[in-house]
A protein has these predicted regions:
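Short, solvent-exposed beta-strand/turn "edge" segments of beta-rich domains on protein surfaces
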Residues: 236, 257-259, 328, 345-350
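Acidic/His- and Gly-rich active-site-bordering loop/insert found
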Residues: 9-149, 171-175
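Acidic/histidine-rich catalytic neighborhood of metal-dependent amide-processing enzymes
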Residues: 146, 152-232
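Short, solvent-exposed loop/turn segments at the edges of secondary structure
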Residues: 134, 176, 207, 228, ...
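A short core secondary-structure module
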Residues: 196, 200, 255-278
């Protein structure tokens, strides 16, 4: 080794040592703020029981939304329960019924100010009872949980928002600005219910300072190396694409098969896509903010890694896609082949076969760019792409804005043991529709939930803790009452 090369290597080693030392110092400096206060308000045992019974009554109504159907019978039954349980809301708030989608307004003292809106959805996904411990629409209260479809997603949100407003109105509360409640009937099937509410605001020339929907929640161990509660506030939703990829051929009898049949070409395409995962990996500003926010609540090795994106960013881009699908979703467009079709008989080669791919475009590689990547591989196998639906990621809420800061403040006051941080959502909510009339769309469900409860939301044995439900009512009440 020549003296020049040795000097270069020595200099590089010195730079690396300095960089690691700076990273270690930064990791030591990153600390979660001390928060030893008690929650701002607690429900009494009587209130806690009442809240559980109200949610149970709502869960017992099977408001399952179905594509191509517009039967509001069960939704009207649910709304009758809500009128009974939240009398002050329906007596004092101005109700606009948009084909079952409810929009309620409590007028504020200053009619010139923009309002705030709390939202959720009345509909639930189907539940056939298979693998359920109890009837999915029993609303059973047992072992300090409310059991049933919609208990977590998201009748708990609707119940807590309406209950909070009902109590505030009963206490004579007069808000400084208009306060709205919006609840749709077809969120689970991406229906147009919430768009009717958005159209209402557009027609009247109204804007909102803040819109808050379901989304992130309060989870323990949300990320590896994070042994505490974290309140994840969804500030951005990834995009959504459904695309049908078709292969055409001459068909024929399976006894004399040609090469490269439609199914063979589709199989090769799917295999290559699964093997290469060809979408761009990047740490976007939103994900960077999420990691830096999470770092303060993590063990030292993870704090050093996520608290120093400037140094470890390239390493994270390699590691995260390999850690888990959950981690990969933060840094890349994800895709999954979900449907397929071909011949109608076992001995017939189809003249056309297809697969459907669902993609969730990242904010750094939008729907158009993600489709270009997919089409590049489809062209290789002489496949046609038919885009069924495509939309980009939502806008990102202003992380330095007053509304995000206020929500974090309320989380600190009501859940002092949970650190609040911005969160990138892989799934979708109705909230994105309100971007047309609101600059600060936040997605947060103030519910402490376990990983098991999170996994059960569209599966069997959906539950919510009774104490956690009560705490969420008090959160919404605190949030609305103290909004200036």
């Amino acid at each position: 080794m020549g003296p020049y090369i040795a000097a270069v290597l020595l200099a590089l080693a010195a730079v690396l040592v300095v960089a690691l030392a700076l990273a270690a110092v930064q990791a030591i400096r990153i600390k979660a703020p001390a928060n030893t206060r008690e929650p701002a308000d607690r429900a009494t045992p009587e209130e806690t029981q009442k809240y559980a019974e109200t949610l149970a009554a709502m869960v017992q109504i099977p408001t399952v939304s179905k594509r191509g159907e517009n039967d509001l019978t069960e939704f009207r039954r649910l709304q009758a329960v809500m009128r009974e349980r939240f009398p002050h809301v329906f007596e004092k708030m101005e109700l606009t019924d948009l084909d079952g989608n409810l929009l309620l307004r409590l007028p504020g003292k200053d009619p010139n100010r923009n309002g705030i809106l709390l939202m959720g959805h009345q509909d639930v996904v189907p539940a056939d009872g298979k693998d359920w411990k109890h009837d999915p629409f029993s609303g059973l209260i047992e072992n300090d949980v409310v059991f049933g479809r919609g208990a977590m997603d998201c009748k708990c949100t609707v119940m807590a928002e309406f209950q909070a407003m009902d109590e505030l109105i009963a206490e004579g509360y007069e808000p400084p600005c208009d306060v709205y409640l919006s609840t749709s009937v077809n969120e689970e099937i991406s229906g147009g219910g919430v768009q009717k509410a958005v159209a209402y605001f557009k027609e009247k020339g109204l804007r909102l300072d803040l819109c808050m929907d379901e989304g992130g929640a309060i989870m323990h161990g949300m990320l590896p190396g994070m042994p505490v509660w974290a309140a994840a506030v969804g500030v951005l939703e990834k995009g959504y694409i459904d695309v049908k990829i078709k292969a055409k051929g001459s068909g024929g009898h399976s006894s004399t098969p040609p090469k490269n049949t439609p199914i063979a070409r589709l199989s090769a395409f799917v295999t290559e896509m699964e093997k290469k995962h060809p979408f761009k990996v990047a740490i976007s500003p939103t994900v960077k903010a999420m990691f830096e926010g999470a770092a303060a609540y993590m063990t030292f090795p993870m704090r050093m890694l996520l608290g120093n994106i400037w140094l470890f960013g390239p390493l994270l881009k390699v590691l995260l896609p390999k850690v888990s699908p959950f981690a990969e979703a933060f840094v890349s467009t994800t895709f999954c082949f979900t449907m397929s079709g071909g011949s109608t008989a076992a001995n017939v080669i189809p003249d056309e076969a297809y697969v459907v791919c669902n993609l969730r475009p990242s904010e750094h590689q939008n729907a158009e760019e993600s489709l270009k990547v997919l089409k590049k591989y489809a062209d290789k196998y002489d496949l046609e792409c038919e885009v069924i639906i495509a939309r980009n990621a939502s806008n990102c809420a202003k992380l330095d804005g007053e509304e995000f800061a206020y929500l974090k403040q309320c989380i600190d006051e009501c859940y002092p043991d949970a650190g609040a941080l911005p969160y990138l959502m892989a799934g979708g909510t109705d909230c994105r529709q309100f971007e047309a009339v609101c600059d600060s769309c936040l997605r947060f469900c103030p519910i402490k939930m376990t990983q098991e409860q999170l996994a059960a939301m569209h599966a069997a044995n959906e539950t919510i803790g009774v104490p956690e439900l009560a705490a969420s009512v008090k959160f919404y009440k605190h949030f609305v009452k103290n909004h200036k």
